[in-house]
Amino acid sequence: MAIVVQKYGGSSVATAEKIKNVAQRVGKVFDGGEQIVVVVSAMGDTTDDLIKLAGQVTSDPHPREMDVLLSTGELVASTLLAMAIKNIGYKAISLSGAQAGIKTDTTYRKARIVKIETKRILDELEKGQIVIVAGFQGITDDMDVTTLGRGGSDTSAVALAAALGAKICERLTDTDGIYSADPRVVPNAFRLDEIGYEEMLELATYGNKVMQPRAIELAELYNIPIRVASSFNDNPGTLIHGGVSMEVRNKVRSVAYDMDVAKISVLGIPDKPGIAASIFVPLAKAGISVDTIVQNSSVNKIADLTFTVTKDQISEAMKVAKPIAKKLGASDIVADSELGKVSIVGTGMQNTPGFAAKMFDTLSANGINIELISTSEIRITCIIKESKVKDAVRALHKAFEVEV
């Protein structure tokens, strides 16, 4: 029998009734002759509630203890789902990440999966069990519990699918697939039947929150198809895979946006080797992730350097960058947190002229000023004022007549 891995998000298991609904769906897959491994997230807002609870105890929780605490959310969901499945007549067993053989490195709160020892899961499947695995977690060689970071249950599911040789990983959530744009912003946005790994990775990185980028990278590496569908209806969803037939057809595949953008500009710094490194190395050591970087052409060997970070890191980034800017003799350093970004994505854009020009012209025609630009072979991203982002999404979706 083929193995199917299903992953249910927090909204799908948020209440007892929803857990019972998931149990019924899992049972139907089992009845179809598949061996099934189910990965679950914590119920609803459990993870956020646990973080708040820790904050009431201490302002500086130890990373190891936080991982132990946060891992309990998925344990609750997995055990309740196993109970619900047993209650309707199936054999089921819940496993923690450790019991499932998920081994990680020692980077608490953002651990990476090193390997998965699949013997326990395979043994349980051979016994006719439906295996429920707590997502988002693993264990180190020293038997310490770790968590995989936000969205880590997606990573758990895809990694398990790869290790088990599953035929597919199904990501069941409160949305019924990947859309040409956010349907809450663009009412006539449509669901995509399929999308390539490369396109999906760009969308996930630049604003589409349905799947985590790490999970997409893993899926592409091990060629694991992912079906994104709703846990509340039977719509077929969107298949994420490596189908080469899509490359020629898709021009602009989807429009994505992200409101979590802040900008720092270091003005009037010397334009010479080592200046950028003197700024970005300390930022990296402080755990600050930098996205778009732009340096203007120098005048009299003086230039301005601008980069973006997430809004929650702007204060820490300024704290790190200010003394460096002063040491470099910068004329000023300024921050702007009222920004967002909008991106167009599609493999058909590769080596095809005109997309950037059309995007910029569309934004200009709608009175939207572009602050920064970044690109890849299949993506163009513009940093703009936060208040204009949704207008930009609607305008671009219409201008490019985004294709099915």
Predicted segments with their positions:
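Conserved dinucleotide-binding and phosphotransfer motif residues
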Residues: 32, 88, 222, 286, ...
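A conserved regulatory-domain signal marking ACT and ACT-like small-molecule sensing domains
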Residues: 237-404
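Nucleotide/pyrophosphate-binding catalytic subdomain
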Residues: 1-216, 308, 384-385, 400, ...
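A structural alpha-helix within SAM-dependent methyltransferase catalytic domains
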Residues: 23, 27-30, 162, 220, ...
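Short hydrophobic alpha-helical runs that function as membrane-insertion/retention elements
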Residues: 168-172, 226-228, 291, 372
